[in-house]
Amino acid sequence: MAKTAMAYKEKMKELSMLSLICSCFYPEPRNINIYTYDDMEVKQINKRASGQAFELILKPPSPISEAPRTLASPKKKDLSLEEIQKKLEAAEERRKSQEAQVLKQLAEKREHEREVLQKALEENNNFSKMAEEKLILKMEQIKENREANLAAIIERLQEKERHAAEVRRNKELQVELSG
């Protein structure tokens, strides 16, 4: 059906060109209402302002073409034992080659997976080392800050102690002078 529709489209494209060429060779007017081809007939139904209408009549296939066409297959020659053996050996070689290729691909895939895993482990170790170093550095800073704060507190306490000792001494001097 699709082939017939395609053939119809091609014939319709050729139709106007065909009528032009025919008018050059045959100056007398032709009946343009009917066109006949090998396997179809096209009749013009009527002309309209919007276009033209055609009736397409498909002819049944001719009885000659109905005969089944059988293609003569090439005659098979008798194969000798040596030829059969050669074909079997060639097939075995192909099988071994394919098997070796599959094994090679699997080995390459495993190697790639191993490399990816190794790289991931190295990155994980590097990350762990960097995190540990950052943590140690942070702990050292906290320890230094704590020691600095403790030293500042001790300094303030010692300053208060000196001030208290000075106040006591001044008080004792006042008591001695007044007394």
From Swiss-Prot:
Main location: cytoplasm
Domain SLD: 38-179
Parts forming coiled coils: 75-179
Classification via PROSITE patterns: STATHMIN_1 (PS00563), STATHMIN_2 (PS01041), STATHMIN_3 (PS51663)
Membrane-crossing residue ranges in chain numbering: none
GO cellular component terms listed in the entry, alphabetical order: cytoplasm; cytosol; endosome; Golgi apparatus; growth cone; lamellipodium; membrane; neuron projection
Tissue: Neuron specific.
Record's function text: Regulator of microtubule stability. When phosphorylated by MAPK8, stabilizes microtubules and consequently controls neurite length in cortical neurons. In the developing brain, negatively regulates the rate of exit from multipolar stage and retards radial migration from the ventricular zone.
Protein name: Stathmin-2
Species: Homo sapiens
